[in-house]
Swiss-Prot record:
This is Glucose-6-phosphate isomerase. It catalyses: alpha-D-glucose 6-phosphate = beta-D-fructose 6-phosphate. Coiled coil: none annotated. It comes from Leptospira interrogans serogroup Icterohaemorrhagiae serovar Lai (strain 56601). It is an enzyme of class 5 (isomerase).
């Protein structure tokens, strides 16, 4: 079970002021389970860990194994919730350094930006390698992944001719959309994105599960993590004992105290993309109607040598939540040297994991002393099962926190603003008039 520790934040919390936020969080949790809140049509994720079909899991595993056995590289194409969840788990659990091969392929991501050098070098990199594609898009028309798939499909056809289709798996809508139409015409293997699950809550659908399977990660253990924590946090009604409700209450309490930035920090570089996934989850869910906490992330101890100064002595507008796995790799022991030129012999006999843990504790003490409340999210280890628990904890907390704020945590209307302007500037049919207006504005500036 995930624990939320407040030992480095308790001095910033007044019980009498926190109480209304605890009550509001529990009320929001009940609203979530009543299926009567805003965005109720997108609650498919809530009970999904109990509803997954073994037949679908087996089919994903079989198709993934086929791609693994024919590919040195598998390119996962998607943006936002279509790639961040799987990338978070892959980056956290796969070795930092490995030599890819057929049967043990390298996983590369594309379609999450529009930078031309990246695509030019990716195409060149793939030209002499056996590769396959998992393209993920509900509609098939999202600009970034659509462009990526167009470019890589062209290369795939050039390399493999009529057999190219056997190297593409599409994760898309069950019955409609451009990608679904293309998949049917090319007879691609397909997996379905449920209509009642939004992108940022979709890591337990084929959106997240299939890329894990092609990477060789046990999706059954990942699913087990979701199932285990669901049974706990759905049943605990005391908001001080339910870590998800408590986290939601504390976040909104700190917001009311003028702390409108939350820093999700980690002391393990493998957790960096967990933070990236978390930023989308909370940013898109809460950042609307001029409300919400701004989600930021930092990688320690690296960022202590850049942003650490601001946290220690800058404007007191933030609080920290620190990802704290209980078990970390500790098999590297520091040995003494005869001359001790670096003056590090005092560390001899200690593992590097122990040194990193003392850095974590020292940082939390320093930041709390500097006026920054620091929460700790304690979970067992960095494994697929523990990450499953952590991700469901965040999804559940985010929905509760959004309802507590009075916003719909399942839509993202503001995302369309940049798309509309981009389409107009690119002369997309139907946007010509807006394009002229925007170009005039740009020229005046």
């Amino acid at each position: 079970m995930i624990r939320l520790e407040t030992r480095f934040a308790s001095s910033f919390i007044q019980s009498s002021k926190l109480e209304p936020f605890l009550e509001k969080s529990e009320s929001a949790r009940l609203t979530l389970h009543s299926s009567q809140g805003q965005g109720k049509e997108y609650l498919g994720w809530l009970y999904l860990p109990k509803e997954l079909k073994n037949s679908e899991i087996e089919r994903m595993t079989q198709v993934a194994e086929r791609l693994r056995n024919s590919s040195e590289v598998i390119v996962v194409i998607g943006i936002g919730g279509s790639y961040l969840g799987s990338r978070a788990v892959l980056e956290a659990t796969l070795p930092f350094f490995k030599k890819p091969s057929i049967g043990n392929p390298e996983i590369i991501f594309a379609g999450h930006h529009l930078e031309s050098r990246y695509f030019s070098e990716l195409i060149e990199y793939l030209e002499d390698k056996n590769f396959s594609i998992n393209v993920i898009s509900k509609s098939g028309t999202t600009t970034e992944p659509a462009i990526a798939f167009r470019l890589l499909w062209e290369l795939l056809r050039k390399k493999y001719g009529s057999s190219a289709s056997s190297r593409v798996v599409a994760t898309t809508d069950s019955s409609k959309g451009v990608l679904k139409k293309f998949a049917d015409s090319e007879k691609l293997d397909t997996f379905t994105i449920p209509d009642n699950v939004g992108g940022r809550y979709s890591v337990l659908t084929p959106v997240g599960l299939f890329p894990l399977a092609v990477a060789g990660i046990s999706i059954s253990k990942f699913i087990l993590g979701f199932q285990n924590i669901l049974n706990d946090i759905h049943s605990i009604t005391d908001p001080t004992r339910n870590p998800a409700t408590y986290y939601s209450a504390l976040r909104n309490y700190f917001l009311s105290e003028g702390r409108y930035i939350e820093v999700l920090a980690n002391f393990n570089p493998s957790l960096r993309y967990v933070s990236e996934w978390w930023k989308q989850l909370f940013g898109e869910s809460e950042g609307k109607e001029n409300k919400g906490i701004f989600p930021a992330s930092m990688d320690f101890t690296t960022d202590l040598h850049s942003l650490g100064q601001y946290i220690q002595e800058g404007k007191r507008i933030l609080f920290e939540t620190v990802l704290s796995p209980s078990e970390v790799c500790s098999n590297l022991t520091l040995k003494p040297t005869q001359d001790n030129l670096d003056s590090l012999n005092f560390l001899s006999g200690n593992t590097l994991g122990y040194v990193n843990e003392q850095a974590r504790l020292g940082t939390l003490l320093a930041h709390a002393d500097g006026g920054v409340p620091c929460l700790e999210l304690v979970f067992p280890d960095i494994s697929p099962q523990s990450l499953g628990e952590l991700m469901y904890f965040f999804e559940y907390s985010c929905a509760i926190s959004g309802y507590s704020l009075g916003v719909n945590p399942f839509d993202q209307p503001g995302v369309e603003a940049y798309k509309k302007n981009m389409f107009a500037l690119l002369n997309k049919p139907g946007f010509e008039q807006e394009g002229e207006t925007l170009r005039k504005r740009i020229s005046r500036n």
